[in-house]
Curated annotation (Swiss-Prot):
Self-ligand receptor of the signaling lymphocytic activation molecule (SLAM) family. SLAM receptors triggered by homo- or heterotypic cell-cell interactions are modulating the activation and differentiation of a wide variety of immune cells and thus are involved in the regulation and interconnection of both innate and adaptive immune response. Activities are controlled by presence or absence of small cytoplasmic adapter proteins, SH2D1A/SAP and/or SH2D1B/EAT-2. Isoform 1 mediates NK cell activation through a SH2D1A-independent extracellular signal-regulated ERK-mediated pathway. Isoform 3 does not mediate any NK cell activation. Glycans are attached at residues 98, 142, 148, 172, 176, 204. It holds the Pfam family V-set. Expressed in spleen, lymph node, peripheral blood leukocytes, bone marrow, small intestine, stomach, appendix, lung and trachea. Expression was detected in NK cells, activated B-cells, NK-cell line but not in promyelocytic, B-, or T-cell lines. Expressed in monocytes. Isoform 3 is expressed at much lower level than isoform 1. It comes from Homo sapiens (Human). This is SLAM family member 7. GO terms for biological process: adaptive immune response; cell adhesion; immune response; natural killer cell activation; natural killer cell mediated cytotoxicity; T cell activation.
Length: 335
């Protein structure tokens, strides 16, 4: 049977063994996951016996124009294969990532010594998601923010081209590559950075990144903060130092005065004659005058007596043993 799988296999083996007459250069096709792609085929052969499509080394579809027979080798491809407009161009739908590869088509005719072939290379790509942007090490010196932005895809898609757009300047700039070096000084007009990721079937944009937000730490530059801190601390420390020095001299002067005063007091105690009383330090008490009547002496009524100390003293011990009795004292020459 002309359309049996055994016959198709024999035709494919015969084609591989005998070689083929190439009709043209390799054609590259691009498709997206879930989409469709058409392998164009234009044949100049008037009488076509069969057309065989293969994927890598596996027969995919065989067409027999005379009987209008289309044989799909694998059942899973029956709903995916189509030949639009009644031609021989192959349309493959519901593309998968593993559909990427090399496709051949061979046109067999009794009028040709070798089959006419055409080679295709199919690349199936996924639609790109939003690219991710990461920031490298940031340096803030003198209010200038210097860092690198890196754009990448989370799933590592193939054949992705990255481009950066810098918006906000007089002329918008573009930068090719996944890494964008930036330098932005605090106080300048704000800038917006956007990463654009492209592949042959799609493109996507990152979220906009504001330089002011990215470099908000530049205003808090450690060096600038340190300078400001020094400018504030130096006068304060200098004032504290001067105050401490003044208090130290004052304390020292008071200690010296105290030592001198103590020495003077000690000298005055040892030699009182050397330290005459100073009028400045003398204090006087004022005694109020009281009216007192001074009695005049009356010689006629005055009694005078002469008291002589006894020549013999009593023994002190005997005085202790004597009872408390009044003693009679002898007075001589009482006038």
């Amino acid at each position: 049977m002309a359309g049996s799988p055994t016959c198709l296999t024999l035709i494919y083996i015969l084609w591989q063994l005998t070689g083929s007459a190439a009709s043209g250069p390799v054609k590259e096709l691009v498709g997206s996951v879930g989409g469709a792609v058409t392998f164009p085929l234009k044949s100049k052969v008037k009488q076509v016996d069969s057309i065989v499509w293969t994927f890598n080394t596996t027969p995919l579809v065989t067409i027999q124009p005379e009987g209008g027979t289309i044989i799909v080798t694998q059942n899973r491809n029956r709903e995916r294969v189509d030949f639009p407009d009644g031609g021989y161009s192959l349309k493959l739908s519901k593309l998968k990532k593993n559909d990427s590869g090399i496709y051949y088509v061979g046109i067999y005719s009794s009028s040709l010594q070798q089959p006419s072939t055409q080679e295709y290379v199919l690349h199936v790509y996924e639609h790109l998601s939003k690219p991710k942007v990461t920031m490298g090490l940031q340096s803030n010196k003198n209010g200038t923010c210097v860092t690198n932005l890196t754009c990448c895809m989370e799933h590592g898609e193939e054949d992705v081209i990255y481009t950066w757009k810098a918006l906000g300047q007089a002329a918008n700039e573009s930068h090719n590559g996944s890494i964008l070096p930036i330098s932005w000084r605090w106080g300048e007009s704000d800038m917006t950075f956007i990463c654009v990721a492209r592949n042959p079937v799609s493109r996507n944009f990152s979220s906009p990144i504001l330089a002011r937000k990215l470099c908000e730490g530049a205003a808090d530059d450690p060096d600038s903060s340190m300078v400001l801190l020094c400018l504030l601390l130096v006068p304060l420390l200098l004032s504290l130092f001067v105050l401490g020095l003044f208090l130290w001299f004052l304390k020292r002067e008071r200690q010296e005065e105290y030592i001198e005063e103590k020495k003077r007091v000690d000298i005055c105690r040892e030699t009182p004659n050397i330290c005459p009383h100073s009028g400045e330090n003398t204090e006087y008490d004022t005694i109020p005058h009281t009216n007192r009547t001074i009695l005049k002496e009356d010689p006629a009524n005055t009694v005078y007596s002469t008291v002589e100390i006894p020549k013999k003293m009593e023994n002190p011990h005997s005085l202790l043993t004597m009872p408390d009795t009044p003693r009679l004292f002898a007075y001589e020459n009482v006038i």
